Regions:
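Catalytic-core helical/loop segments in enzymes performing group transfer/polymerization on anionic/lipid-linked
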Residues: 1-546
């Protein structure tokens, strides 16, 4: 049959369509109340995730065509960053819509995003019975936000540079370093959120703070006498150029739909200050490397644009650079594949230190050279989990840090409370999400280790699902409507995924206890190994992770 493409505002009814679904990509990001929910196309969440699983190679091919575009090295879309860019989601919606257009049903597709709307309209079998949404309001808003965001960023950078500049005096060439973010759980007593107590274990190890760390936090951490802020090493003459720091992609020729989505990615990335801050980070780290010339440095590695530039600059001054796996790799963390480094291994760390063997295998499957992969242990998830299972315990809902996803989780679970089920709802530590408590649906602020025995854990994004899995607690991965929740579990971990429609049935089924083998996923960090790693930096001291 065909697809009828419309905006939410114009969708007064189904018309000639048999079913409908919404991309939920516009400013409202919500489904219309006017359309009958019984006629909503079923299984959209499942099919959308399947489409997202299938678009990686297409995204990579498009990213390769951006090489040479102005400021391409500052952008997230060319790195296939699924957290920092929603380009892959746009490709998935287009793929799903193309598949629906080949089916037997006539389907109404709602889309309020003007770029995605035009990309879908270019597909075979898609008809636009009404008006196409205007581009200019979104363009005007994006440009205005971009200028304001960059102006604010320049002001912050100027202040941080002035406040931190004295730190330059304490830098002597050589030595051992870690480069970290200003995490609230780090302190000036030798504990770091990313590297545990390594600063107490390795004599002479110093800490360098990323430019995302504000001055007050940097000053508190610098009280140890071994921590300095990268802001101190920036070139103040660069500040005017930060106003103009934005990726300007040239849409690829030959595919109208792809061209619209590339334009969209460029506009969205320019609507904030991410490119400006990446340029400042690259300036600071390059100047620091030329001055400090460290022997060895490690940092929480996620293969972001600034990290690729850092690896190139470190190698140019003879520094051995070690990327320590920060976020879990997972099947949707596309940017961590070595094939996304468009300059080959020049922008890869000399060594990638993995949390465990499973992560080494996943990275190897994405093209990371085996000889660079090292099993180093997990500082952030070390030790046996203190969560426990009870078939009669409450169900924990570990909310996502994305309010769009957290809202769907609470709306899906709340109607199921008070029917013999007890839900404990825990906010993400980095995102407060206000919600109304009710019978059997209560908030908890307890850490995982202090919670009562749980019968299940429902999660959407983050590592709470992995922690529960390792503790032997049945886990349900919530699949939201309108978006793919990034699956961050290793490829060998298979758990049940459910959407809002299937949640009740999944909870009615007897729980299946996971047969978790912690040793195959995560290993304990060995202090002797880490000391040798920083003392020698020699490949002979490393353990194969693949």
């Amino acid at each position: 049959m065909s697809v009828f493409l419309s905006t939410t505002r114009e969708a007064a009814g189904l018309g000639d369509a048999d079913a409908w679904f919404s991309t939920m990509t516009g400013p409202s990001a919500a489904e219309p109340a006017a359309l009958p929910r019984a006629r909503r196309l079923r299984g959209v969440s499942e099919h959308l995730e399947a489409a997202f699983d299938a678009i990686r190679d297409e995204w990579l091919a498009i990213a390769r065509k951006t090489t040479g575009d102005p400021n391409q090295e500052l952008a997230h879309m060319p790195t296939l960053s699924t957290y920092a860019s929603d380009f892959g989601m746009m490709l998935a919606w287009r793929r799903l819509t193309a598949e629906v257009a080949k089916g037997r049903e006539a389907v109404l597709v709602l889309c309020d995003d003007p770029w995605l709307f035009r990309a879908l309209a270019a597909l075979d079998g898609v008809t636009v019975p009404g008006r196409t949404p205007a581009l200019w309001p979104r363009l005007l808003g994006a440009h205005g936000r971009g200028w304001l965001a960059r102006a604010a960023a320049v002001g912050r950078v100027a202040w941080y540079w002035w406040a931190a500049r004295r730190g330059r005096r304490d830098i002597a060439p050589g030595g051992k370093w870690i480069l970290v973010y200003g995490h609230p759980e780090s302190d000036a007593e030798g504990n770091d959120a990313y590297f545990g107590d390594l600063m107490r274990q390795v004599p002479g190890l110093r800490r360098l703070l990323h430019t995302d760390c504000g001055w007050s936090r940097a000053r508190a951490l610098a009280a140890d006498g071994r921590t300095v802020s990268l802001h101190a090493f920036g070139d103040i003459r660069l500040l005017p150029a930060l106003f103009l720091a934005r990726w300007k992609p040239r849409p690829p020729a030959g595919n109208v739909g792809t061209a619209w989505l590339v334009r969209r990615a460029g506009v969205l990335e320019a609507s904030g200050a991410a490119a400006a801050m990446t340029r400042w980070q690259i300036s600071c780290q390059s100047r620091w490397l030329r001055r400090a010339r460290p022997a060895v440095i490690a940092w929480p590695w996620e293969n972001h644009p600034w990290e690729r530039a850092f690896a190139r600059a470190a190698k140019s001054v003879g520094t051995r650079c070690m990327g320590y796996q920060h976020s879990v790799v997972g099947r949707h963390m596309y940017n961590q594949g070595a094939d996304t480094n468009l300059d080959g291994d020049a922008s890869l760390p000399d060594v990638v230190l993995c949390n465990g063997r499973a992560y080494g295998r996943d990275l190897a499957a994405w093209g990371m050279p085996h000889e660079r992969l090292v099993e180093a242990g997990a500082f952030r998830l070390r030790g046996a989990s203190r969560m426990s299972f009870s078939p009669n315990g409450p169900i924990l809902i570990a909310l996502s840090n994305d309010p769009f996803l957290a809202r769907q989780m609470t709306e899906a679970a709340r109607p199921l409370a008070g029917t013999g089920r007890r839900f404990l709802v825990k906010e993400h530590p980095m995102c407060q999400f206000p919600f109304e408590e009710s019978e059997g649906f209560t908030r908890t602020e307890q850490p995982f280790a202090a919670m009562p025995p749980l019968s299940r854990v429902i999660y959407c994004t983050g590592t709470s699902g992995l922690e529960a899995y390792l503790a032997g607690i049945p886990v349900l991965r919530f699949k939201p409507a309108g978006r793919v929740a990034m699956n961050v579990l290793p490829a060998e971990v298979d758990i049940v995924s459910v959407d809002a429609e299937g949640l009740a049935a999944a909870l009615d089924r007897p729980p299946l206890l996971p047969a978790a083998n912690r040793a195959s996923l995560l290993s304990e960090p060995d202090p002797e190994f880490w000391r040798a790693l920083f003392e020698t930096g020699a490949p002979a001291a490393l353990k194969d992770a693949s």
